[in-house]
Structures are given as structure tokens and as C-alpha cells.
Amino acid sequence: MIYQTDNDKLYRYLFKDRAVRGEWVRLNKTFTDTLNSHEYPRIVRNLLGEMMVATNLLTATLKFKGNITIQIQGNGPLKLLLVNGSDSQQIRALARLQDDVYDDITLSELVGNGILVITIAPTNGERYQGVIALDKPTIAECLEDYFIRSEQLQTQLLIRSGEYEGKPVAAGLLLQIMPDGTGSQEDFEHLATLAATVKNEELFGLTAEELLYRLYHEETVEIYPPSAVEFHCGCSLERSGSALLLISDDEIENILTEHGGSIDMQCECCGTHYFFDKKTIEKLKA
């Protein structure tokens, strides 16, 4: 049974005697809202859920206001998968396919010759971008390698996505040595071994407190108040109109003529339709 109180929540916690920190997140309505306007194949849905969980876990490590974008770019059946999340745990995502996808396809087959790009964008400050090879079987393993190479922080990511009680769900754990250098490799490996025993039904069905007790009942764990996670697209008539105005006047006129005097622009993330006739476009130009 799913405990509703911990749906769409992110928890941070600290192992008091080990100098290791952790995070747990579960996406229920957030994941469903993301999928509502799309008919992705099962393997793409699950990968999208994994990427959303990873983005939530990474944004929770930010020490500043801003957002993180994680995207897969490839030349396989999956051309693009993009997730954007903010420090306030608002998230949006989309995928673009360019070929048919079968159920037992591997990540490397799905993406082809692809890369994972992480863009960290502070509200105030310079953007940072890292490019990661998709040379591991899972997104979680690729991101673990990223933390070791870019931040020299031993990190474990356990991410699962699928269905529970007939509904889409994605969840995950992050375990990381404290960046102040006080944590030991031995402590981290001990906790990582315990975390690796987690089952899907535990990630998908237990409360954070119950899950952490199940995994770490002999440890002293301080759990901090949770953050709510939600799907938030951010699209609007004005933003869609700004994109439309990048097209030349002649081309806009041709499109209006071809489509009976109204241009329909649909948001890729949430599926909302925005309609522009000649009068609306003239107002946007004013």
C-alpha cells in the first residue's frame, strides 16, 4: 500500500556518526502529470522517471538558487530526453523519438552514439555544463561516475521507475560522503552495501521514515523536514508567442493562410495548446 503522505516528497537525512548524507525522493502525481499528455513506450517512460528522480536528487544538493537540466542526446531511436528541475523541486520533462522502440532494448541501443549533458544554472552566476559518456548500463551509474570525476565525491544512486499498484511511480536514493572531507570510505561502503538491498516495493510503497528504518535501523539517522515535489511546466501564451515571432512575417502569413487563419502551438512538456490569429500576433508585436 502506498503511504499518501510521502508521495511527491524529497527527504534529506544525515548519518550522525558516519559523516555521510543521503536523500530519498518518490514521484507519484508528479510523474503521472508528466506522462499525461504523451504516449511514450514503456522503456522510455521508465527512463524518463529515472531521469526525473536523478534531477530531483541533484537539485537537492545545490547550495544556491537555480536549476539543473539533464539531457540525453543521441542518434538512436531516442533522439532527446530532457529534464529540468529547480532548487524548489519544480520539475518538467520531455522525450523525442525518431524511430520505433521495442520493450527489451538496452540503454545503449536506445540512445545510440549518445551523451548525457548536465547544465547547472545558478539564478545569479555563471552556468556550468558537464558532458558524460553514456558508457554504463544505467543512468544512475553514469551519474555516479560524474560525481567522482567532477566533484571527487563518492556517491551512490539507486533509482527505480515503473508501476506500483497500477500507477506510474519513480523513486530513488542518493548516498554521498560529506564534502568537508570528514567521511571515510569504509563508512560510505558500509552504508552503500545496506542501501543496495532495497527492493522496488520498499522504494515505491514505504514512508521515508519506515524505509530508512528498514535499511539503517542500527544507525543514527537525522531526517530533515521534506520538500514537496511538483510538475511545473512554466509555458504560457506569451512564451509561445515569443517563439512564434522568431519566424519572419512572410512565413507567419503563409502559415496563417495554410491553417485557416489560426496557428496552433502545442507545448511539448504539458501538451497545452496556444492559438494565434492575426489579431493576437499583432498584439504580441506591439
Swiss-Prot record:
Under oxidizing conditions two disulfide bonds are formed involving the reactive cysteines. Under reducing conditions zinc is bound to the reactive cysteines and the protein is inactive. CDD domains: Hsp33 (cd00498). GO terms for biological process: protein refolding. It comes from the Bacteria. One of its GO terms (cellular component) is cytoplasm. It is found in: Cytoplasm. Pfam families: HSP33. Disulfide bonds join 233-235, 267-270. Its main location: cytoplasm. One of its GO terms (molecular function) is protein folding chaperone. Keywords: Chaperone, Cytoplasm, Disulfide bond, Redox-active center, Zinc. Redox regulated molecular chaperone. Protects both thermally unfolding and oxidatively damaged proteins from irreversible aggregation. Plays an important role in the bacterial defense system toward oxidative stress. HAMAP family: HslO (MF_00117). Belongs to the HSP33 family. This is 33 kDa chaperonin. It comes from Histophilus somni (strain 2336) (Haemophilus somnus). The lineage of its organism: Bacteria, Pseudomonadati, Pseudomonadota, Gammaproteobacteria, Pasteurellales.
